[in-house]
Amino acid sequence: MSVIIDIHAREILDSRGNPTVEVDVTLEDGTMGRAAVPSGASTGAYEAVEKRDGDKARYKGKGVLAAVEAVNGEIADTLVGFDATEQVAIDQTMCELDGTDNKGRLGANAILGVSLATAKAAADFTAQPLYRYVGGTMAHVLPVPMMNIINGGEHADNPIDIQEFMIMPVSATSIAEAVRMGSEVFHTLKSELSAAGLSTGIGDEGGFAPNLSSTRDALDFVLKSIEKAGYAPGDDMVLALDCAATEYYRDGKYELSGEGKSLTSDENVAYLAALVANYPIFSIEDGMGEDDWDGWIALTEALGDKVQLVGDDLFVTNPARLKDGIDRKAANSLLVKVNQIGTLTETLAAVNMATRAGFTSVMSHRSGETEDATIADLAVATNCGQIKTGSLARSDRLAKYNQLIRIEEQLEETANFAGRSILRG
């Protein structure tokens, strides 16, 4: 009865108005799982390949009809008849069918859509929520959210080089309380920016994108808003940054053009260390460029005992890249993006490898999202304790927060909000 009888993909639009792939997997008993695939703006060079049509006359080349056809053709022809509960076999079969190291022939967006839709169908078939189906009976930890309230870099049209300024409500006792705290700071920040005559337009991930002059200017606005909302920076809320440094790492230098700085790797480490010394920063993502391994090692030596150093472009959720980082002692945390590697099985393998090495994991959205809230379930399934899914605006971001609230309600007294347990030291 859990045999797959139909796989159907379609082209839909993501939160940026760009095409993406949505897949329905239907089982013999009529159960259907549906998944929509996210897409990134700042992408790592080592990510699995997202297949785009390249026809400039249609969606400016961003169409995904070829990926849709790959699902409706080759992938469906191969997987119809498989048992949906055999997730590992299904994912492995798709990887073998693709035949490349980066899923470039069929497209990671095609393969991932089928992988996630299959898991959802199997979860429904077994009458379990997705987090329970994937994570088993021990899945009960609600993650602390990294809430992106100021956008810069590739996510906004302003001079700030660092891509994301985030708050983490660690003193909350539930995900519902954490969301409330974040919302209150978000709206306070809006009032503060407006009072200063700055734009309150929002970026791709729902954070504000004001025309601020520097990283410290942005951090000062965030701290003031936390305090005015009635919370204590460093106690109730800690800060997280996503530098996305690969985007401004050129010819061996970190070109912070918005601030008129050109830094060597050692100078960039010192720049970040100074921020950590002056602000309650708990986590820094992609503080160094994806190919600057020596810089990553230096950053980890300098800050790794007191700051979570998250590899996104560095690791691209790839177990092979992650193993390299573990061996080199570069970073101490993995950012988990399902579309970087392209299957649920490989995503879970990366999280397991990180955990065994003593790394933390942060489940993450992409800047191009949909109403699909799968990552909320995966955050709970893996007990990773942290999720990065944007601001307190845009329904594509709030879909994930709302799903976490529902999961917390379902878990009742067994729910455990990670809270301060994530803090280092």
UniProtKB/Swiss-Prot annotation:
The active site is at 205 (proton donor), 337 (proton acceptor). Binds a second Mg(2+) ion via substrate during catalysis. It holds the Pfam family Enolase_C. The lineage of its organism: Bacteria, Pseudomonadati, Pseudomonadota, Alphaproteobacteria, Rhodobacterales. PROSITE patterns: ENOLASE. It catalyses: (2R)-2-phosphoglycerate = phosphoenolpyruvate + H2O. Catalyzes the reversible conversion of 2-phosphoglycerate (2-PG) into phosphoenolpyruvate (PEP). It is essential for the degradation of carbohydrates via glycolysis. Mg(2+) binds at residues 242, 285, 312. One of its GO terms (cellular component) is phosphopyruvate hydratase complex. Gene3D superfamilies: Enolase-like C-terminal domain, Enolase-like, N-terminal domain. It is found in: Cytoplasm; Secreted; Cell surface. Belongs to the enolase family. InterPro entries: Enolase (IPR000941), Enolase-like_C_sf (IPR036849), Enolase-like_N (IPR029017), Enolase_C (IPR020810), Enolase_CS (IPR020809), Enolase_N (IPR020811). Its cofactor is Mg(2+). This is Enolase. Pathway: Carbohydrate degradation; glycolysis; pyruvate from D-glyceraldehyde 3-phosphate: step 4/5.
